[in-house]
């Protein structure tokens, strides 16, 4: 048992001999230095380096020639942090051995990659901002030209009426008159005047003379019957049941004759329709100021507008 313990205790130096044979006892282990270098930059530190955004939503303000642009503390602080982190994290005892420099080579390459990426983004944002400043500076450097920018559409001095050519309205609204009766022949004056339809309830209710006759002589019932019995959508028999020019004239008149036996008020429709035509003609003759001649010549009569004279008493 003692021999095995001695042989077992003597086996440990034999196992450690090939592993520690090429290094002195006072030198540090390069693998320990590598594990220390791996933890130089953590994820929070990398995020802290790239947490600022130098891009702006609007155009940058052009600095005046008399004033110097203020330094950007965020950019300087960023570069200080980029260059300061690897320096503070380096242990001082690793600067005197080649083993430590070979172990630090891949780590420094990763740090330089991060710093070069941040520098490239900073360079891109700086170049974009400088190009915007050059564009804005060239536009604002003109001086009086920039002050004379037109912001409101200029108005023409001429009135719209002066640009229009002479038309019929320039000669006068009622310049064209009939040669026989001497009345105006414009469309407004020669249009026939219908009977008023809003003459009750202070012009709030529509009650035309035609509707009064239709409901008073029960023709509205005939129109409703023809409307429901008609198969053609384009058939206007319901609108003019007594018309002789439309289709199915004999059928309509026969149906109205049969219905007049039950509705004797239908016999009053034709006399009431004649009275309506007579009243319409009388009302139109009184209220229409234009010409009612069928065949007549048109004469243009323009009376020049002369300003009134001021008759002063002689002194």
From Swiss-Prot:
Transmembrane segments: none annotated. It is found in: Cytoplasm, Cytoskeleton; Cell projection, Ruffle membrane. Pfam families: Sprouty (PF05210). Disulfide bonds: none annotated. Residues 177-291 form the SPR domain. Residues 1-15 have a biased composition (Polar residues). Residues 108-140 have a biased composition (Low complexity). Residues 178-315 are annotated as: Required for interaction with TESK1. Residues 20-32 have a biased composition (Basic and acidic residues). GO terms for cellular component: cytosol; microtubule; ruffle membrane. Keywords: Cell membrane, Cell projection, Cytoplasm, Cytoskeleton, Developmental protein, Membrane, Microtubule. Cleaved at Pro-144 by the prolyl endopeptidase FAP (seprase) activity (in vitro). One of its GO terms (biological process) is animal organ development. Residues 118-315 are annotated as: Required for interaction with CAV1. Residues 1-140 are annotated as: Disordered. The record marks 144-145 as: Cleavage. The keyword Calcium does not apply. Belongs to the sprouty family. Antagonist of fibroblast growth factor (FGF) pathways via inhibition of FGF-mediated phosphorylation of ERK1/2. Thereby acts as an antagonist of FGF-induced lens retinal fiber differentiation, may inhibit limb bud outgrowth and may negatively modulate respiratory organogenesis. Inhibits TGFB-induced epithelial-to-mesenchymal transition in retinal lens epithelial cells. Inhibits CBL/C-CBL-mediated EGFR ubiquitination. Forms heterodimers with SPRY1. Forms a tripartite complex containing GAB1, METTL13 and SPRY2. Within the complex interacts with METTL13. Interacts with RAF1. Interacts (via C-terminus) with TESK1 (via C-terminus); the interaction disrupts SPRY2 interaction with GRB2, potentially via disruption of SPRY2 serine dephosphorylation. Interacts with PPP2R1A/PP2A-A and PPP2CA/PP2A-C; the interaction with PPP2CA/PP2A-C is inhibited by interaction with TESK1, possibly by vesicular sequestration of SPRY2. The Cys-rich domain is responsible for the localization of the protein to the membrane ruffles. This is Protein sprouty homolog 2. The lineage of its organism: Eukaryota, Metazoa, Chordata, Craniata, Vertebrata.
